[in-house]
Amino acid sequence: MGTSCNKINSNSNKGKENMHFVLDDNGDSKGNASNQQVERDDKLDMETTRWNGKEFEEPLSTNKKLIIQSNNTSSQHSTPPLSISDTSTHTGSSTDNVEANPNTGFSSARKRSLRSSNLKKKFVPLSSPEESNESEFIDDDESDEVASIIDIKEDETFDSKVEIPEAAPSSSTESDEESIPLSYQSKRRRVSARASSSASSSSRTQAKSIPSHERTHYRLIRQHPELEHVWEKLEEEAPREVKQIEQPKELVLNLLPFQREGVYWLKRQEDSSFGGGILADEMGMGKTIQTIALLLSEPRGKPTLVVAPVVAIMQWKEEIDTHTNKALSTYLYYGQARDISGEELSSYDVVLTSYNVIESVYRKERSGFRRKNGVVKEKSLLHQMEFYRIILDEAHGIKSRTCNTARAVCGLRTTRKICLSGTPLQNRIGELFSLLRFLRADPFAYYYCLQCECKSLHWRFSDRSNCDECGHKPMSHTCYFNAEMLKPIQKFGYEGPGKLAFKKVHSLLKHIMLRRTKLERADDLGLPPRVVEVRKDLFNEEEEDVYQSLYMDSKRKFNTYLAEGVVLNNYANIFQLITRMRQMADHPDLVLASKRKTVDIENQENIVCKICDEVAQDAIESRCHHTFCRLCVTEYINAAGDGENVNCPSCFIPLSIDLSAPALEDFSEEKFKNASILNRIDMNSWRSSTKIEALVEELYLLRKKDRTLKSIVFSQFTSMLDLIHWRLRKAGFNCVKLDGGMTPKARAATIEAFSNDINITIFLVSLKAGGVALNLTEASQVFMMDPWWNGAVQWQAMDRIHRIGQKRPIKVITLCIENSIESKIIELQEKKAQMIHATIDQDEKALNQLSVEDMQFLFSN
């Protein structure tokens, strides 16, 4: 079968010649003169070639009716005839027949100069004429992608191969074929091969529709066959049975039933293929004591390394000494105590250090530090030693896979790894990856090459161009966690492939994580009830005038940005406007006093956060040399969404800052005192605010009810705490304060004084310094002075007192000024909390992300 081949003749006259032919479905041709144009029923593109300066149009498939008109400009020779053979009705293919035109006097063996410089797309039919009238064009750059799609389809079926058939032998003479340049022969073979694959075109159309994450999956399996049945094997392996371990003899404190189960699970998990796991009990359920019991339940040889936030280091040491009767020897590897030999350090049972120290010694070992003689590198003792076990407290601190702290922690050497976190997934599914990488969970935390057998736990591209292991490009590598879980969830949410990815996440977590909540274990815990209230007050007349002036000015600026469509471009300005309004709701002096410079200007510029205008707590510095509170700049970046294209709120250039960098070391307590707001205002004529007086009223009522009740007052602004401290002392309350300018020993002494001194009834705590890793069960009342749209920070603060050991009913009061931005912030906080609870770890929007719509809501009347 096949259509007849018709010759296309042209006159040999000089000058301009018009040639027109019509090739119908039966292969019949007709001639007619016309101007240059190309018409086709379905607008099929034609391949334009040039023969000795003459242009002609050659269809790659003739199953459609083609009308081709050409207006050729004559040169020395006329256009030779072209014979076209229809191949669309065959499963095979034949090359184009080119014969000599007797009218021209040229033989078919003549050397022909063919070019295809005008060819912009190659037509590749991906479906047969009988199945579809649709066709697809594939660029030159996509030709390799077509082959890869076919290979992927081959992997998908696993029972048959999709082959590209070879072109059928040409019906022309051998001399005719040889007369065509090799470059054109090669191109025609490729085009012919694709056109001849119409028998399998339906399969290729389906292959093209395979989502990118599935194509990555098939390519992974092709290069790494061991990954084919990972999830089946994981499902077959039942989660470890949880039993109760016997009470360790050296442990003074009696473990609760669920805590004994936790210790048993930790022991079994260390013996599993994962070599550890994540203990994710809700905050306040005794993760620390369960870990101490684990240390006592095994013979001790090499030391165990405990990495915790600075504020929690002394608490760990105190609990180990108290609950084990000093059966475990501990060493605090921090500050000046880092000058110790490896042999001496190995003699201790437990080594305690902070994330900041781990990052600092790792950076000095890898990158070095500048001295007069150049860059000096210093070996890290912690990274040279091999520990028996490594425990990460508040492990969500390494949730960012790209931060240097995460790299530093993953560089430690051990075979047993435990993560402790009440919130392992705070905002995004992607936060789980850093914990998996620390656990060295195989294959979930590894990077794989799609072109060879290369496999690595870390992203190793020293020159940012080629893999250090195999030499292939970054685009040829993928993370198994991303390919199997993160990408499908990001793209599809909780539907289709996204739902399957969620099931994979849950299946994995069942094998590496143990989580119990207070509600589930209420009978074991016996915790008292907790009541959460919001107290709403109104500005007085003077405060409202000042606030409205600031609010209207801020709203005018925001509306200008909104009208011009540059809200996100001015995000730093808007964030500062919101911060100023929050401060104004606390006390007008927080905003007005920020403009008064009564201390050394240069000194203050170095220690004041550029976001909140407070003394920077847990201070870190950006690449543009501006100082921020770690919490302030973290919230600032998180509120922007993905953290990309965020500008510095001070100089407005792109912000570059390491959120995990160690705190600046030159922030002494004396500097904090000198920069206090009390040194910038006249306290003799100072007047309190509505919110501070509301707090004083609540504390008076508590003291009248029971003088032994203790309270904690949380605020994000240290200047607000300074004003509260001054006012409460005037009112006769004995209180202490914890902020970011205190050393670990000073913090520990302050906490001990509050816990043991019955005369100290109020603890003023900065959210930036004491929101996590504190055990303050001596208090039963909590006052939140300034609400924030991300309620997670406040929830963690509440759990500082609602935990094991609490005997009194808990009451949490959030103070809110009704006619201010705070009322809308609370509404926004509730809306976001409902969104998180209504979805399963939604990945597209973080809990603390502040969208344009949220900003509009905050600035609405």
Swiss-Prot record:
* Segments of this protein annotated with the region Disordered: 1-217
Name one molecular function that GO assigns to this entry.
ATP hydrolysis activity
Helicase C-terminal domain location is 695-848
Any idea what job this protein has? Involved in global genome repair (GGR) via nucleotide excision repair (NER), in conjunction with rhp7, after UV irradiation.
- Mark out the compositionally biased spans (Basic residues): 109-123
Protein name, entry field:
ATP-dependent helicase rhp16
Position of motif DEAH box? 393-396
Q: What is its EC number?
A: 3.6.4.-
Please state the residue ranges covered by RING-type zinc fingers: 609-652
Origin organism of this chain? Answer: Schizosaccharomyces pombe (strain 972 / ATCC 24843) (Fission yeast)
Q: Name one GO cellular component term.
A: nucleotide-excision repair complex
